[in-house]
């Protein structure tokens, strides 16, 4: 079972690297401003995806029940309801389809991931969150980026 997941993650990682290289070549060319912004946002999210795959491989994640997998912000298509479900840890919600605009995306770090987990756990408990810290450290941008990810105006 472990070998299957390891091979699967390695295969995905190889495909992902190829796709990322193609996007980087595309953004180096001549593009309109809006197209460049979209591609750069896609590259930012793809680099995070690559890092997640690397982490899953290095942690020898044994299946979808592992915390290394459940702590990631994930999107699932529900055929029965024809909706997109968003999951992270114990939090589950439907995609809200709130278009925020063609904006850049935040570079997701381990601290950003922890903030996402904390804020979504608060939402699950019908509470709210107020990130705290020094000025200019990305508290507002992290909250706004989570809103963009789940398509919910915050």
Predicted regions and their residues:
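Helical mechanochemical/support elements of P-loop NTPase systems and associated helical scaffolds
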Residues: 111, 115, 139-142
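Extended, charged/polar low-complexity intrinsically disordered regions
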Residues: 1, 9-110, 114
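Walker A/P-loop
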Residues: 121-154
